[in-house]
Structure formats: C-alpha cells, structure tokens
Amino acid sequence: MSDLLLSMVVPAYNEEKRLPDTLHRIAAYLEAQPYTWEIVVVDDGSHDQTGYQADDFARAYEGRGQIRVIHNPHCGKAYAVRTGVLQARGEFTVFCDADLATPIEEIHKLLPMLESGYDVAVGSREGLGAQRIGEPFYRHLMGRVFNQLVRLLVVGRYRDTQCGFKGFRRSSAQAIFERLRLYTSPEQVKGPMVTGFDVEVLHVAHKLGLKVKEIPVEWHYRAGSKVNPFKDTLRNLSDVVRVRLNDLRGRYDAT
C-alpha cells in the first residue's frame, strides 16, 4: 500500500478566475484531515494565467503538502484527467472539476466507500440525498435524456454518469484508464472539449468486473461553465455510440 492516501486530480483549462480559490479550498480542507495527500493539477494547455497560477500555488504550499503541476498541450479534459490519474501516487485517486461544482467536503462520502472495498466511487447528482443547486431546468432535462440513452446503449445501472467527481482505488484506476480508447492520443483541439469519457470509464469498470458505488452528492451549477449544452450533448452522444461499437468489437475485453 502507498504511504500516500489520497491524490486529488484537478484538470483545468483557462480557469484563471476560479482556479486559485478552488486550489486553496481543496488544500485547506485536506490540511485539516489526518491522512496524507497530494494535489495534481493538469493544465490543459491554457491560454490565460492558469498554468502560472498553478505553479505559484505549488511553490506557496511547498513543504505543507505535495502539489504537482502537469502542463499538457490542449488536448481536452478527458486527456487531462487521464494524464493526472495515471500519474497519481495515492492509494485512492479522486478527480474533480476546476470550478469545484461538487464541494471538496463531499469527498467524505467517497473515501469510506473506497476504504470498505469498492473499486470506484461515483458522485451522483441524482438519487435520495443528492442536491442540484442553481441548475437551469433545460440543462437538467437534457442531462436526464442523455443519461437515459446511456442506460439504453451502454451502462444501464447508473442514474448519473456525468458528474465530475469520481474516486478510484489506485489499482482500479490504473486498470481502467490504461484500457480507455477515446481521447487517449495527444491530439490538440480547439476550445473547450467536453466529452462523454465518463461513460467509457464506467463501462470499462463494468467490463473488468469492478465494484462500483454511486453516491448522491451536492452539486452547484456554476455561471461561466464551458459546457455548450447542445454541441456538447451531440459530441457526448457520438462518444456513447463509439463506446458501444468498441465494445461490440471486443476492444474493452479484459486480458
């Protein structure tokens, strides 16, 4: 077992207005915990001050916690998350969005599940106890329609596949993310790249026979979100179809 308990992976693209507060909130929370931790910031080729802010944060917290910054070319969130997860050193790895839509305090719901033997703990904006705060109705409706299609085509057991707050045991994270087929090449993209990679992550977990727990969490809609509900929904649906086709071709079969 690793001496480091928790790795927090934070992908960030052009987040200069939100990243400093997010990182300070995460670090302040973790400093109050009895376990060892690290924060892994993956700068997704930002054009603003995001990368510099992350580097400054790492220097400021030197000696108080392990802070690492990875500078990627702009290849999209999926590639950034995969980079961070595969380089995480903790026994458990949790990734979250740079806007901290799910408060860091919600991690206390995920870690006990991982400690009790679950391989993956999935934050969910649906189910008893979940809270979706400030979300426009049309966004919620589109999300529900998308998830119904996901349940029909790929993974039928989850009420919410897209919440950006997911935790893994280290061995499980390595097994899952090494088997992903979408967005794994360092191909540069333009603009925000919101994809359906969460669906592929959960599908691979299912194919590997891993134990997955879906956990209702608190989630806040953030103004200035980079999600384009129409364009990104179409891309996500395309990704779901690609996952289904990959599955039919046996590309996720355990070896």
Q: For each predicted feature, which ranges?
A:
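N-proximal low-complexity "stem/linker" segments adjacent to membrane-targeting elements
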Residues: 1-28, 35
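Hydrophobic helical membrane-anchoring modules
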Residues: 1-5, 179-255
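Donor nucleotide-sugar binding loop of glycosyltransferases
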Residues: 15-18, 46, 77, 103
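Short helix-capping segments at alpha-helix termini
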Residues: 30-35, 59-66
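Short beta-strand/loop segment that forms part of the nucleotide-sugar
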Residues: 35-46, 70-71
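A conserved acidic beta->alpha catalytic loop
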Residues: 43-52, 100
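Acceptor/aglycone-binding surface of glycosyltransferases and processive sugar-polymer synthases
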Residues: 66, 70-87, 92, 104-189, ...
